[in-house]
């Protein structure tokens, strides 16, 4: 109908950006739990783990150390038989696609989960249910890469030294990210927070200003 406002929100992409990960087992465990609990199904779910490096060797070492954390999260949070089966199905499908050379990258398989280290730097969807892409993305390339997805970005899970956080937060905001949180809190919501960068109800509420007459000024 004329004058009817439409809901304009669509699918969004979220990711984790790690500029430091050695010695951060608690934060990485929280990220692994987020990946398993959300299964990559939410707009705020991490689709790609970006590492602040351009060395694939560092990406390889990260994947080898992170797979056990994913397996531990899988054992903890997939209690139902259906959940275990779904995660295992996606993991085996990913493994078969790699075996048939249909998917690029190096596969790091785990129990009901997997990591795939890719050489490109693009933000894209992961295979879901604990099967996640890992890519190297140094800070100098972060802005142009993310701006290619501007308008589709939502949450960034940021893990970095405290002194680097203000600069990285500003950089992510400039790229178009609308929510920045610790990696394990990417899908946690806060009362009154915005959605995709705005307070949605303001678009569907009409503001009426009313001024009451006062005794000394009736008109």
Where are these regions (language model features)?
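Glycine-rich beta-alpha junction loops
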Residues: 11-15, 22, 48-55, 161-162
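Rossmann-like NAD(P) dinucleotide-binding subdomain of oxidoreductase/dehydrogenase enzymes
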Residues: 1-36, 41
